[in-house]
């Protein structure tokens, strides 16, 4: 199943190819491919209108979004515009593959005007959100499965937002507080009402999960802790690494409690630099200042965190090959034989420990 960021990006690109304005509305969601598609749409000289909540997908500062050529309007105004526009799924702008027609794309990938005056030029509505609630319901119903959930678990990567200072520092402060309190890793999974306000994307995804669950309990987490918890052994003692597409996180867990954490952006790392950071982190030599100077988030290790800790470092995540062939003593973790579901297993494990699993409502888990 493609990520929502990819789906939304395809819908925007299709509208660009059809030379149609876009109305983008809904909650804040993950960026990346959708942001690139928005920039290409604006560069093609086409209007891109976004409700304030959806516009936060592209930057936490709406003035920065406006500077990129997006017309940012109140959510209510975006909804009114959407009422007179065509949904992306029904616009005909996206075909079965959701991609632009080849006749509209030049050799460089730029969108070209065809000069076809008969084209429908009404705006296309593109809905934001990390979960497509109605789409998921339709898939389940199409398979004959009742969309009645015992519980819904959701995880997204969220840098966090602060109106003052650095988002990178604010995100790492969440790790530092958890370590200072020596909290169990399971405490980094929150019921819907307890998701910290700084995690705006996760709160938005949690609201969609609540809508999907229709009253079922919801558990939410960042993707980093979800994957790490899925890979953590029953003993609760381990050095764990999740080499994700966005972030790489290493934690030291003792008796299931956080005793150390290092976090960086995966795009800034190669195998040699990651191994070097990990060695210095586990030696107690790496500082948050050094990591931040390199564009990462930070590093902190509790005194005595590694005393008596035996066994190899456990590595998971889609970018785990960064450490393949390294000189570190490590093991590639694939819970239940499927590395790409490590985060899902972490969510289910936390749900079970939080008492959410097994609450039968006669439907789907």
Predicted regions mapped to residue ranges:
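Nucleotide/phosphate-binding catalytic cleft detector across ATP-hydrolyzing
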Residues: 1-238, 264-272, 284-365
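Gly/Thr-rich phosphate-binding beta-strand-loop-beta motif of the actin/hexokinase/Hsp70
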Residues: 236-254
């Amino acid at each position: 199943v493609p990520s929502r960021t990819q789906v939304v990006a395809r819908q925007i690109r299709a509208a660009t190819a059809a030379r149609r304005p876009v109305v983008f509305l809904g909650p804040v969601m993950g960026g990346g491919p959708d942001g690139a598609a928005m920039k290409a749409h604006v560069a093609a000289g086409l209007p891109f209108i976004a409700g304030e909540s959806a516009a936060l997908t592209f930057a936490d500062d709406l003035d920065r979004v406006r500077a990129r050529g997006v017309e940012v309007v109140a959510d209510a105004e975006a909804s009114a515009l959407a009422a007179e526009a065509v949904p992306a799924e029904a616009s005909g702008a996206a075909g079965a593959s959701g991609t632009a027609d080849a006749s509209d794309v030049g050799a460089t990938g730029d969108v070209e005007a065809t000069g076809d005056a008969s084209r429908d030029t009404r705006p296309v509505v593109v809905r934001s959100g990390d979960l497509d609630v109605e789409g998921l319901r339709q898939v389940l119903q199409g398979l004959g499965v009742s969309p009645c959930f015992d519980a819904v678990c959701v995880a997204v990567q969220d840098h966090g937002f602060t109106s003052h200072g650095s988002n990178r520092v604010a995100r790492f402060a969440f790790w530092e507080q958890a370590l200072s309190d020596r909290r169990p890793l399971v405490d980094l999974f929150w019921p819907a009402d307890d998701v910290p306000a700084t995690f705006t994307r996760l709160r938005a995804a949690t609201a969609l999960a609540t809508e999907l669950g229709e009253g079922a309990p919801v558990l939410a987490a960042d993707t980093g802790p979800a994957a790490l918890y899925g890979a953590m052994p029953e003993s609760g003692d381990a050095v764990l690494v999740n080499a994700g597409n966005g972030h790489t996180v290493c934690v030291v867990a003792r008796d299931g409690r956080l005793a150390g954490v290092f976090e960086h952006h995966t795009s800034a790392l190669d195998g040699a630099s990651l191994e070097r950071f990990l060695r210095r982190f586990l030696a107690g030599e790496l500082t948050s200042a050094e990591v931040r100077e390199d564009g990462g988030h930070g590093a902190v290790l509790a005194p005595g965190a590694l005393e008596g800790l035996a066994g190899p470092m456990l590595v998971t995540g889609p970018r785990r090959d960064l450490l393949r062939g390294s000189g570190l003593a490590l093991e590639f973790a694939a819970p239940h034989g499927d590395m790409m579901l490590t985060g899902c297993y972490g969510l289910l494990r936390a749900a079970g420990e939080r008492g959410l699993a097994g609450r039968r409502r006669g439907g789907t888990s």
